[in-house]
Amino acid sequence: MAAAIMAAEQEAAKGGGRNRGGVQRVEGKLRASVEKGDYYEAHQMYRTLFFRYMSQGKYVEARELMYSGALLFFSHNQQNSAADLSMLVLESLEKSDAKVTDDLLENLAKLFSLMDPNSPERVAFVSRALKWSSGGSGKLGHPKLHQLLAITLWKDGEGCANMLVEYSSSRGYRSEVDMFVAQAVLQFLCLKNKTSASVVFTTYTQKHPSIEKGPPFVQPLLNFIWFLLLAVDGGKLTVFTVLCEQYQPSLKRDPMYNEYLDRIGQLFFGVPPKQTSSYGGLLGNLLNSLMGTGEDDDTEDGQEDSSPIELD
């Protein structure tokens, strides 16, 4: 099979105008190898072809082959091989002069959405993807990519928690271990996604190596979030008000917390709406684009969501 694939690749190299057809034949032979269950051999052939294409300056062919290969391995639940090819997609973008386009951003978001939430490669992938999409002009990455990634995280509380644990452990300050999950929980609640808010909090506090078993927790902010999730289930405004008053010292650590809580008060406790600014913070950098920051949109959303949610 390897000889047949290499022969097809050599034919593609000679094809000139027929180059795309040759690449498609290579893809077809690789697909057949994967379909037969020859995962290791196919993976190695993908890598061999990638470095050959890159050395020849065929960045587009290298990227497209790795992207289709990653999707193929994902469809066969070969997470390690798929994640490796996904990283090679990024490498092809980083080493070429490829311009940021919607299609490329959507491809990267697709790969991210298929990665195992527990995979350490997921954090590395999203960090490199955001860095590439910034084009060197900013640190946060392209807004379109933020939006696409946010949709995946919004749907997957456990995956979000695992990524936050990995990110906090490898790149965050130990003193801010509680702030990572607080941002995520508060913003999930601002999106009316109570289920994901609970999942991300439980998963994060159980898996983070720097958090002692609770509740109650050593960190006051974690206790506040725990009580807040219970209060949301109860829907009693007096409980919510007292809770926010008692934990003001912890809530002052980030000026955005009270803005989140204003919104949460509107959504779950019937507090009258007030004008708010856009959402921010670690996860908010992703969710901000999803929620929108236009004045007209904010006004309409505020009117639509101002009534309290019916709680059992």
From Swiss-Prot:
A biological-process GO annotation: tail-anchored membrane protein insertion into ER membrane
Family: Belongs to the GET4 family.
Keyword Cell inner membrane: no
Subcellular location, record wording: Cytoplasm, Cytosol
Role description: As part of a cytosolic protein quality control complex, the BAG6/BAT3 complex, maintains misfolded and hydrophobic patches-containing proteins in a soluble state and participates in their proper delivery to the endoplasmic reticulum or alternatively can promote their sorting to the proteasome where they undergo degradation. The BAG6/BAT3 complex is involved in the post-translational delivery of tail-anchored/type II transmembrane proteins to the endoplasmic reticulum membrane.
Complex and partners: Component of the BAG6/BAT3 complex.
Protein source organism: Gallus gallus
Source domain of life: Eukaryota
InterPro entries membership: GET4, TPR-like_helical_dom_sf
Disulfide bonding pattern of the chain: none
PANTHER family: GOLGI TO ER TRAFFIC PROTEIN 4 HOMOLOG (PTHR12875:SF0)
Compositional bias (Acidic residues): 294-304
Name the UniProt record assigns to this protein: Golgi to ER traffic protein 4 homolog
UniProt KW Cytoplasm keyword: yes
Gene3D superfamilies assigned: Tetratricopeptide repeat domain (1.25.40.10)
Keywords: Cytoplasm, Transport
Region (Disordered), start-end ranges: 290-312
Gene Ontology CC: one annotated term: BAT3 complex
Main location: cytoplasm
